[in-house]
């Protein structure tokens, strides 16, 4: 698992940008089968998750059936074996190599985005935006569904990985709208 930052970075670097409706990547089989099985084996028990509704990050109308496990804050809630596993994943996704692969892949998009900030965006982000990363597992027990929405102004990249334990729900996921 020590080479995750290289594997993850190579997946980004070797993928083609899809431009419609906006620049993005769609990568099938991002995780190799054996590693995917390890992920499944190491998903924390639901008791370790927090209701997103209780985090103060969403409105009171948000689904009470959605839970979050922060891979930065919540690792001490789980057994050492799982903690070590998720630390390795964090090290891959939060590595300099992964950031360089991603920012290089989207260099034109980033340049265009930050050269054309509106006044409102500048007020929120500042002249020189500060970049931070967060990783989390999200679990939904009813119907994972969010209506059409824009993302937060202060997000540069979002990486969404669907981790079903079987193929029953293989046709659901994220829809992109113009």
Identify the function of each model-found stretch.
Residues 1-20:
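Fe(II)/2-oxoglutarate
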Residues 83-178:
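Catalytic core of non-heme Fe(II) oxygenases with the double-stranded beta-helix
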Residues 7-11, 73-74, 123-125:
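Short, flexible segments with low predicted structural confidence
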Residues 1, 5, 78-80, 125:
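Intrinsic structural disorder
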Residues 14-109:
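Non-heme Fe(II)/2-oxoglutarate
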Residues 6, 37, 135:
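Aromatic-glycine hotspot motif
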């Amino acid at each position: 698992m020590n080479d995750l930052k290289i594997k993850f970075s190579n997946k980004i670097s070797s993928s083609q940008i899809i431009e419609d409706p906006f620049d993005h990547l769609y990568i099938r089989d991002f995780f190799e089968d054996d590693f995917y099985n390890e992920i499944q084996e190491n998903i924390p028990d639901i008791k370790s998750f927090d209701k997103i509704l209780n985090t103060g990050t969403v409105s009171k109308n948000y689904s009470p059936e959605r839970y979050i496990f922060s891979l930065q804050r919540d690792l001490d809630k789980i057994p050492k074996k799982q903690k070590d596993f998720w630390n390795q994943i964090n090290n891959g996704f939060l590595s300099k190599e992964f950031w360089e692969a991603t920012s290089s892949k989207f260099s034109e998009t980033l340049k265009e985005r930050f050269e054309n900030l509106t006044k409102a965006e500048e007020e929120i982000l500042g002249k020189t935006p500060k970049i931070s990363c967060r990783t989390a597992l999200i679990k939904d027990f009813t119907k994972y569904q969010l209506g059409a929405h824009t993302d937060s102004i202060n997000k540069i990249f979002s990486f969404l990985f669907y981790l079903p334990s079987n193929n029953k729900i293989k046709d659901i996921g994220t829809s992109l709208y113009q």
